[in-house]
Design a protein with these regions (language model features):
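Predominantly flavin-linked oxidoreductase catalytic cores and closely associated redox partners
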Residues: 1-126
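Active-site catalytic microenvironments for nucleophilic, acid-base chemistry
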Residues: 14, 24, 185-192
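Active-site-proximal flexible loops/turns
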Residues: 20-23, 54, 166, 177, ...
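FAD/FMN-dependent oxidoreductases across multiple families
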Residues: 73-79, 100-180, 191-205, 209
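Short acidic (Asp/Glu) and glycine-rich catalytic loops that position anionic groups and cofactors
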Residues: 90-95, 158-162, 181-184
Length: 289
């Protein structure tokens, strides 16, 4: 700082995915792997409030919509698209694993442009004005990538502590709550005049009483599951799209014929044996078995 260094008896580390200070303190001994990081990239597009409410079917200005899109939008690779409304803007983007982008030599802005031109997305942002383009790295390793959460004079929160639930797209809430709990612990340390790891261990105890550590432990196998089962990003979304399209359409065919075609559509993409194994693996990853 131009005004000099700032000293404090306790520091709450909120440095995000680039965990330089966390490493310097010896709370973690490695960089996060690209396979455990997602890159979220988006455009913020300006539209007037009335247009947003009309296009998204919002009855009141206090209401909003968040949409998640799975499958072709990420080229069938691990990732997901999103659209969410703000009062006078719409945010449109995708999240894809960093190693996937590198392996397939994909340029994020080209993938995003393809997404924006999708017939389901383009009408929502038609005639809008681009205000921002941005990207953000998100740690998705979860439980296995968490550093030690406290030491003498310091606590680690949010993305810096890999507090992200990839399945439920939770991270902001965990950052806010962990920051609050760290602040409560810091206040207690000030009252005691003791900023040692013994006192700051109260931060982890507070986390254990809530949902963050419980959920991260339960879903500790989920990131690995996504790495080894790309079918859930490409094969199965495509199948469900075709199956539901057929199910809710009137073709003038006997329903037995329709169900036979749906069944054949699945087995053409994935054998029943493998599909059953995929379901079991997903259950284990989600339930933490």
């Amino acid at each position: 700082r131009p005004q000099g260094e700032i000293y404090a008896p306790v520091v709450i580390i909120c440095e995000g995915v680039n965990n330089l200070l966390t490493q310097k303190l010896g709370l973690i001994d490695h960089d996060l792997e690209p396979a455990h990081m997602a890159l979220a990239f988006k455009e913020v597009i300006a539209l007037d409030e009335a247009t947003i409410n009309s296009r998204f079917g919002l009855p009141h200005k206090e209401h909003g919509v968040a949409v998640s899109v799975l499958g072709d939008v990420s080229l069938g690779l691990p990732g997901m698209g999103f659209v969410y409304t703000n009062k006078k803007t719409v945010s449109v983007g995708l999240g894809m694993m960093l190693d996937t982008l590198a392996e397939h030599k994909l340029r994020p802005y080209e993938v995003l442009q393809r997404y924006l031109e999708h017939p389901a997305i383009a009408p929502l942002v038609k005639d809008g004005q681009l205000l921002e383009y941005g990207g953000h790295l998100i740690p998705e390793g979860g439980w296995h990538d968490m550093p030690q959460l406290y030491t003498d004079g310091a606590m680690v929160t949010g993305d810096a502590a890999s507090m992200v639930n990839a399945l439920h797209w939770e991270g902001t809430n965990m950052a806010m709550i962990s920051g609050k709990l760290a602040a409560e612990t810091a206040i207690e340390a000030h009252e005691r005049g003791d900023f040692s790891a013994v006192t700051l261990s109260g931060y982890k105890e507070r986390l254990q009483e809530g949902f963050i550590l419980r959920d991260l432990k339960q879903y500790r196998k989920f990131s690995r599951f996504l790495e080894t089962h790309p079918e859930f990003m490409g094969t199965y979304p495509a199948f469900l799209n075709d199956a539901l399209g057929g199910f809710f359409s009137a073709y003038g065919k006997p329903k037995r014929t329709l169900f036979t075609e749906i069944f054949q559509s699945l087995t053409h993409r994935r054998s029943l044996f493998k599909a059953a194994g995929d379901i079991v693996s997903m259950g284990r990853a989600v339930l933490g078995w």
